[in-house]
Amino acid sequence: MEKMLLKSTTRHVRIFTAEVVNNDLKYHPNKLTLDLDPDNEFIWNEESLKKVNQKFTELVEERAGKSLDDYELRKIGSEVEGLIKYLLQNSLLSYNPECRVMNYSMGLPKTKEVL
């Protein structure tokens, strides 16, 4: 029986048991692919992207030898989502004012007027 591609989706993180081949996702039992901020809700800088990718790599390496099932994918996605919130709260990431829908999904921005 052929295995199905698994995915875990949070608001800002999508993880697939796949690799990208010619811009298509192809199932791979031992590889994960990260799709970060698919709605472009944030403005990313190189440092923030690097931190998220490093965290993702750490989380995947911690699970080496474990089954890449729905539960493990959700745990990884939740931890990456938590890092995104941390980056936003510490002004290392900002909301994108050009985003299709501005809903402040991780809380209102901190500005001098609000503080």
Curated annotation (Swiss-Prot):
Regions that span the bilayer: none
Record EC number: 7.1.1.-
GO molecular function, one term: quinone binding
Signal peptide as annotated in the record: none
Function per UniProt: NDH-1 shuttles electrons from an unknown electron donor, via FMN and iron-sulfur (Fe-S) centers, to quinones in the respiratory and/or the photosynthetic chain. The immediate electron acceptor for the enzyme in this species is believed to be plastoquinone. Couples the redox reaction to proton translocation, and thus conserves the redox energy in a proton gradient. Cyanobacterial NDH-1 also plays a role in inorganic carbon-concentration.
Subunit structure: NDH-1 can be composed of about 15 different subunits; different subcomplexes with different compositions have been identified which probably have different functions.
PANTHER family in the record: NAD(P)H-QUINONE OXIDOREDUCTASE SUBUNIT M, CHLOROPLASTIC
Protein name: NAD(P)H-quinone oxidoreductase subunit M
Organism (species): Prochlorococcus marinus (strain MIT 9515)
Phylogenetic lineage: Bacteria, Bacillati, Cyanobacteriota, Cyanophyceae, Synechococcales
